[in-house]
Amino acid sequence: MGILQTMFIGFDYGTANCSVAVMRENTPQLLTLENGSALLPSMLCAPTREAVSEWLYRHHDVPTHSDENQALLRRAIAANRDEDIEVLRNSVQFGLASLQQYVEDPEEVYFVKSPKSFLGASGLKPQQVALFEDLVCAMMLHIKLQAESQLPEQIDQAVIGRPINFQGLGGDEANAQAQGILERAAHRAGFRDVVFQFEPVAAGLDFEATLSEEKRVLVVDIGGGTTDCSLLLMGPQWRKRADRQQSLLGHSGCRIGGNDLDIALAFKCLMPLLGMGGETEKGTALPILPWWNAVAINDVPAQSDFYKIGRASCRERV
């Protein structure tokens, strides 16, 4: 029996989309992730929130190293049993398939879009951190399996892009929390070795291949959740250096991205069509907050308040 070879991938775990690439004859090659596309929208769905944790354990033997992950798994199995929910191998869906399933039956499907947006949120309780870790792990595991189905080798090493500042108001603490979630999730998904690279630096490497002399290059990376800028020295003398710290002249990032544009458009253009700005029968202006909570998809408290209203309305109908 031959020895199974292993390899590494470049992994873009994005707020809006995910992609992975491998090196083939010194050239990066994107792998297909969904319906012939190299992009997988950062979405997943399951019958319940708890189904994701049980799916990882029951169908993929994903380990639960921490006490909080183990407690989350026990609660998940008990909750699914109480609701008579059987977690099957295809119970968790990803990308556009998850969106289609959610649209067909929104009241019976647990749907998450852009989980990366929440990783740096302040005030997350340990059980919430454990849940986000499971959500990220499920997506990474799915992507890893999709990639390995196209390769003769197993993948156990990953270079993962990360923004300079994750979304959140906690500064360095938020960045450490978010990267910790990504790193633990990647290890649990089967990546033995995991390293991180600032996304603007990674984006600039492709441009560097076209340079014949050293240049100062400003790289602007506008993503779904963040906008990052880096000023780099680039050129032939830097290409083969593994450590690019000396070439990084400066970097900065803000927690504003494509999701914020989507939120602003939905709030200004869509919410008025759904009643925002209206009045009660007595002529009192309706509060704006419920409509804001509906569109603020990167705000955990706002989304919690919005879905509490939805659940209360469902109970009243029942």
Question: Could you say what each language-model-derived stretch is?
Answer:
Residues I222-S230:
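A phosphate-binding catalytic loop at a beta-strand-loop-alpha-helix junction
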Residues P41-P47, S53, Q70-A71, L233-R317:
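Phosphate-binding glycine-rich/basic clefts of nucleotide- and phosphate-handling proteins
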Residues W55-R58, G95, V103, G257, ...:
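Glycine-centered helix-coil hinge/cap
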Residues Y13-N17, G225-T226, I256-I263:
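Conserved A3 ("GATE") glycine/threonine-rich loop of ANL adenylate-forming enzymes
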Residues N26, T32-R81:
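Extended N-terminal export/anchoring regions of large proteins
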Residues M1-L40, A76-V219, L233-C254, C269-L270:
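N-terminal phosphate-binding loop and flanking beta/alpha elements of the actin-like ATPase fold
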Residues C18, P28, A51-V52, T227:
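Hydrophobic residues embedded in beta-strands of well-ordered beta-sheets
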Residues L56-D61, Q128-E133, V318:
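Short, polar loop/linker segments at the starts of domains and inter-domain junctions
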